[in-house]
Amino acid sequence: MLLLLLAVTAAAAVGAGPGKAVQFLAVGDWGGVPEPPFVTPREAATAAAMGRAAAERGADFVLALGDNFYYDGVRDEWDPRFQETFERAFAAPELRALPWFVLAGNHDHHGNVSAQLAYSRHSERWRFPHYYYSLRLHVPGTNATARLLVLDTVLLCGATDDFGVGATPRGPPDAAAAEAQLSWLQRRLAAARHDRYVLVAGHYPVWSVAEHGPTQCLLRLLRPLLRRHRVTAYLCGHDHNLQFLHEDGVGYVVSGAGNFMEASQTHRAAVPPGAARFFYGAPESPGGFAHLRLDADHPTVRCRERY
């Protein structure tokens, strides 16, 4: 299937939260279940905790890191899953007031990702302009800016089964489209050299100690670019836990605990020595997400669960 992928650039209004900072919540793998009630207890608990964090800590937007609808995405833009798994599940007033910037995961690609793009016309808070896109953020009260580059790592690397130990992507469905996305990313990273912070987001991890481990395709294609352009952090989901890793000046945030929680650290030996700084995947956990804050002079990431 030939996919026509367009670069999209948008501006995000920030500064709603307390303090002179860009703040946002990052949650991945949050997509409920395909039968009633279409949400899991962990998704409900995570949604409630995100609402409290937005109210108490502040947030300007939510970054949804893929696997938005388990297990096979959505059929069309009128699919009731948009209401059952998203609109009604994340219904706290503090969340309803925030835009959600969305990317696709492998389970979304089992269904109709174009329908998720089209749903942006039906919901004021669902912002999914294209498969990959760029956001420029302004730190309020300062001259500092941040660039967020949102990717489709499934189109870069291929599909995979989310529930298989070490399952690896099978290669891009369209090599030319994958190359176009990579070229777009290279240009955007080069253009972001004057931004205080540069964040890149995708579904598959670059580094992970957990069940799926490092994504070899991204180690080959993405890691050199992140290091060369001194990217602040790469954010992802796919592994169902919370992690922070740091390698060669780049932070790696894994936030895939919105719907499931897994304790596996099968691939701890596969990451560079000393890179893994934080891991949380307690089976009894109610789920979790990350809260990121970009001040004028430093970034902060906090991993959170129900509190």
For the regions a language model picked out, list residue spans one by one.
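Extended active-site neighborhood of metal-dependent phosphoesterases/phosphodiesterases
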Residues: E35-P37, Y70-Y197, H212-A233, D239-D295
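Cleavable N-terminal signal peptides of Sec/SRP-targeted secreted and luminal proteins
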Residues: M1-A12
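N-terminal active-site segment of His-dependent metallophosphoesterases
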Residues: A10-P80, E179, R187, V209
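Residue-level marker for buried hydrophobic side chains located in beta-strands
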Residues: F24-A26, V62-A64, V102, V200, ...
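Short, solvent-exposed aromatic-acidic interface loops
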Residues: C303-Y307
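Hydrophobic residues embedded in beta-strands of well-ordered beta-sheets
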Residues: D297-V301
